[in-house]
Amino acid sequence: MTIMARARGRRSSVQASDWETVVHQSFALRARGFVFLLAALLAGLVPGSALLKAQEAPTAVIHIGLILPTAGTTPLQAAIAKSAADGMTYAEDDFQLNAELVGIDFKIVKETASGAAAVTAAADKLVAAGAFGVMGGFNYAEAKALGDWSKAKNVPFINLAASSDLLRNQQCTPTMFHMAPSAAMYMDALAGWYVRSNLRQWYIVYEDTDEGRAQYERFRASIRDRHFGAREVGATRLAVGASGGTSLVSAVRRANADAIFLLMGAEGQLRILAELDKGGITAQTTGFPYPETQLREFYEMSAKAAPTLGVGHCAAAWEGTIDAYGAREWNARYSSLFNEPLQMPAWSIYHAVKTFYESAVFGGGDTSAANIIAHMTNQDNVFDLHKGLGSTFRPWDRQLRQSLYLVKINANPKDRISGAILVGELPAIYMPGTELVERLDQLGDMQRQTKCK
């Protein structure tokens, strides 16, 4: 049940004046969302006289498919699933209210599935239920499977959380778009932040997988080509699930590194952090920002596993304490509703819904694949991500341009909200003499580098 549905169910227990106050407050918090609805009215999608009959005769059908992750078997998987479900409810509340005002038949059609085979079966069910586009992908395998599925079925797909550069290059498809920042974007941002702090000598620990090796090569290119004086002073390749042990500790110490980068999943990062911390390593250490590592639950685990190294800096697609660009109210309302900070999975789902919804509304209610894809790839169409800069999808790999955040893990938080401290943003919002796209394209692979065909 949506938030608004629960509110409607309680309406009889409050006074009319109280209800009006609630509605006015809700409208104020949603003010940014009404811009595209006004545009729809002006464009003739919903004639003004039709507003009085909005509930009787929907003027457009906008049904969006969402594949939620299962709760899994670990606390981090459960946290991802909860954030995703809450993000869906948050988006459903906002856009259902907006749609009702102009007579749009709006619905988020959902399935819950994890794993490549399961998510493609779920995607088929969503389309059969009337969804014109599908959102999903909480890891590389799922996003790869859904990208291939979307191409075969000619259904627009938004990748919510998988960062692999392979999906934006050799494995790209014309129907797959990326809400999640790419690995290249994350790594360029981290390199920029650390090098600007005069941490230039890097030791890299990476997993022996296709994705791990690709991340390693891309990060080496970032520090070599973009940052004068930065260099790799050592590297260790580990099998998935393997420990580094005393040999890794000795290698890092001999390398005299300023910074250590762990290119592996959440469990691997926690394991290596603990080993290095126990071995007395003090170099600044960070890990690749997979979705699981952008959660308050991970920050708490990191601080516990490695009291010295585990309270360092991390990159994030979103941070629940951002208080600029309209994000303050947006974050605060989410926290008041769910008693949680707004985290990456919820952020990604909300804005993927918003992207599909706006593309359909601005397209006159035409939800054909050709129309939706044309709107999303049009460089004149800007999407607001609550990040202060209007965003567009890069035409060469359909990656959404956006800024990223640097947070520091709080070793002694007083509550979940304060579990992370926002300390930086890249690219800088205000850079005189530069264009918007130029600023955002500081992060990630440019057209000359793409292998997307």
Segments the model singles out, each with a brief description of its role:
Residues 2-11, 17-20, 24-27, 34-41, ...:
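Extracytosolic ligand-binding ectodomains
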